[in-house]
Amino acid sequence: MKPKIFIDGEHGTTGLQIRTRLAERDDLEVISIPEAERRNKDLRADYLRAADIAILCLPDDASKEAVSLLEGHNSTRIIDTSTAHRVHPDWAYGFAELTKGQRERIAEARLVANPGCYPTGAIALVRPLRDAGLLPADYPVSVNAVSGYTGGGKQLIAQMEDRNHPDYLAANNFLYGLPLKHKHVPELQLHGRLDRRPIFSPSVGRFPQGMIVQVPLFLSELEGSPSLAKVHAVLTEHYAGQDIVDVVPLEESAKLPRVDAEELAGKDGMKLFVFGTEDHGQVNLVALLDNLGKGASGAAVQNMNLMLGK
């Protein structure tokens, strides 16, 4: 019997992307609630309970409600793409490449919290350095990032694309989260193994999909004042054998005149770069990904596959 997959919120940006990814799969049965009935709580509960895996593509409060509808129905496993459970100790963090054994934790879990798009890039850069002992736990980490506007969901998409929208945004790039209270920070701090709350400055560009995340560091403040090659080697070793995360060779990175945020749009991979100059003792770690790929829908499907033993 084919496993049943229910995408609760399949008509939203992330849900639609997941539905598209599963459309050609003949090894699954995707069960869908009619769009007109998506607010029917009792019917949603029936679909949730009928599924082998429920993928929640909902706002935080709605995700919490969906989880509550499954209380006492432990046969349904859950992947939550919201922020609601990413720092909850009972939920496996759905970043398969996070550390050794994480794939197995996801595969065996009933509850999986899909990572946020920005934290995916930032944690991919920070966590290996923490685990290797290069990055002190109390280092004052700063994360700068730009995302495609689809990361803001249907409302922001309309504001960026519809010139007749009452709140149309003409800006080609804008900063937000200005008070430094972005909801992704607790996740970034916990799974990045940081003692100090990192500074996170996100922005949105006038392009649909894509993302660049930057973590600049002073080499002299890292353990042993490592070289660029050493930092690169730590990342390379951490992601050795991974087919989704690619650490770009140092020599190749040194020849690049620029990094295009849209390079991986529509793809589920992630590229990591090490830039900098040892003359000034500075390194800039960069992650390149699709905010809707490895940053959302692609990761959800990857986690689903792991949970199904695929």
Curated annotation (Swiss-Prot):
Supply the EC number(s).
1.2.1.38
UniProt cross-references to SMART domains, sorted A to Z: Semialdhyde_dh
User: Where is the protein found, in the record's own terms?
Assistant: Cytoplasm
Alphabetically sorted, this entry's keywords are: Amino-acid biosynthesis, Arginine biosynthesis, Cytoplasm, NADP, Oxidoreductase
Under Gene Ontology molecular function, one entry of this record is: N-acetyl-gamma-glutamyl-phosphate reductase activity
Query: Which SUPFAM superfamilies does its entry note?
Result: Glyceraldehyde-3-phosphate dehydrogenase-like, C-terminal domain, NAD(P)-binding Rossmann-fold domains
Outline what the protein does.
Catalyzes the NADPH-dependent reduction of N-acetyl-5-glutamyl phosphate to yield N-acetyl-L-glutamate 5-semialdehyde.
Q: Which NCBIfam families would you find in this protein's record?
A: argC_other (TIGR01851)
Task: Report the protein name in the record.
Answer: N-acetyl-gamma-glutamyl-phosphate reductase
What is the source species?
Answer: Brucella suis (strain ATCC 23445 / NCTC 10510)
